[in-house]
Amino acid sequence: SVAVAGAVIEGATLTFNVLQ
């Protein structure tokens, strides 16, 4: 669903920010 896609995108963005 759209909500799940949004959560996945936010999780990936957060992980990306932490790893940088």
Curated annotation (Swiss-Prot):
GO molecular function per UniProt: toxin activity
Subcellular location: Secreted; Nematocyst; Target cell membrane
Transmembrane segments: none
Region entry Plays an important role in the hemolytic activity, spans: 3-12
Gene Ontology cellular-component annotations: extracellular region; membrane; nematocyst; other organism cell membrane
Keywords attached to this entry: Cytolysis, Ion transport, Membrane, Nematocyst, Secreted, Target cell membrane, Target membrane, Toxin, Transmembrane, Transport
Region (N-terminal region): 11-20
Family from the record: Belongs to the actinoporin family. Sea anemone subfamily.
Designated name of the protein: Equinatoxin-1''
Organism, as annotated: Actinia equina (Beadlet anemone)
Lineage of the organism: Eukaryota, Metazoa, Cnidaria, Anthozoa, Hexacorallia
